[in-house]
A protein has these predicted regions:
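A conserved beta-strand-loop-helix scaffold within acyl/acetyltransferase catalytic domains
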Residues: 59-61
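Vicinal oxygen chelate
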Residues: 7-16, 44-46, 64-89, 109-114
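Hydrophobic alpha-helical segments and helix pairs
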Residues: 85-123
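A generic structural signal for ordered alpha-helices
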Residues: 2-3, 64, 68, 96, ...
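Short, structured motif recognition centered on aromatic/hydrophobic residues
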Residues: 8-12, 25, 31, 56, ...
C-alpha cells in the first residue's frame, strides 16, 4: 500500500567526505552502502540487514543551486501520488524546482524543490 501523499517516505545523505560518512554510519548502525554505478552518478543505496533504508551521495565538487558547494546534509522526501502534477502544483504555490523528476531503480521517481521560504524538500 503506498504511503499517503505528504508523508515522509525516503531520506538521503549528501556528504563532501564520503569515506568518513560511510565509516561513521557503518560503525554506528551497521549500514552497508551499494554504488549504483556511473549511469546513476554513483548514487549509493544504504541498507540495514538487507533492507534498503536510505540513499547516499558523494557531493564533493558538485555545485549547489546558488553555484557554491553543496553542504553536507540529510534530505527528506515526501510521498506524492503524481510527481509531475505535484511539481506543477508546488510551482503554482511558489516553489522552485532544483532537480526535475528522475527515476531510481527499486525506489521510484523523485525530484527536489524549495518551498517559498527556500527550504529544500524532496518529492
Amino acid at each position: 500500500m503506498p504511503q499517503p501523499t505528504g508523508t515522509p517516505t525516503w531520506i538521503d545523505l549528501g556528504s563532501n567526505k564520503a569515506e568518513s560518512s560511510r565509516a561513521f554510519y557503518q560503525g554506528l548502525f551497521g549500514w552497508s552502502f551499494a554504488d549504483q554505478g556511473e549511469e546513476l552518478g554513483h548514487y549509493e543505496m544504504v541498507a540495514k540487514d538487507g533492507n534498503i533504508i536510505a540513499g547516499f551521495m558523494n557531493v564533493e565538487g558538485i555545485p549547489g543551486p546558488d553555484g557554491g558547494p553543496l553542504v553536507d546534509r540529510w534530505d527528506i522526501f515526501l510521498a506524492v501520488d503524481d510527481i509531475a502534477a505535484r511539481i506543477d502544483l508546488a510551482k503554482k504555490h511558489g516553489a522552485t524546482v532544483i532537480s526535475e523528476p528522475m527515476t531510481m531503480p527499486e525506489t521510484g521517481s523523485f525530484a527536489l524543490i524549495t518551498d517559498p521560504t527556500g527550504a529544500a524538500i524532496g518529492l
